């Protein structure tokens, strides 16, 4: 199990981006969150099996999301097992 935290910049607030991430994350069997940041970016935290996390990160990086993704910066960590669902914050 792994976790990644990604900062997604672009036109990602007010366009359904967080709902998209939550839905995709749940379909992949992940837990985590998608949170609006004050600078207009969205922070995505996802945890679960590495292949599923890589699939979600790939979706974020390819730009096939609501709005427009200009940049994705991700940091990988060991899973912390402190999350129970995928939430939109």
From Swiss-Prot:
Domain (Acylphosphatase-like): residue spans on this chain: 3-89
Keyword list, A-Z: Hydrolase
Active site annotation, chain numbering: 18, 36
Domain of life: Bacteria
Top EC class for this record: hydrolase
SUPFAM superfamilies: Acylphosphatase/BLUF domain-like (SSF54975)
GO molecular function, a single term: acylphosphatase activity
Catalysed reactions, as listed in the record: an acyl phosphate + H2O = a carboxylate + phosphate + H(+)
InterPro entries linked to this entry: Acylphosphatase (IPR020456), Acylphosphatase-like_dom (IPR001792), Acylphosphatase-like_dom_sf (IPR036046), Acylphosphatase_CS (IPR017968)
Keyword rRNA processing: no
Known EC number: 3.6.1.7
Family label: Belongs to the acylphosphatase family.
Protein name listed in UniProt: Acylphosphatase
Organism: Frankia casuarinae (strain DSM 45818 / CECT 9043 / HFP020203 / CcI3)
Gene: acyP
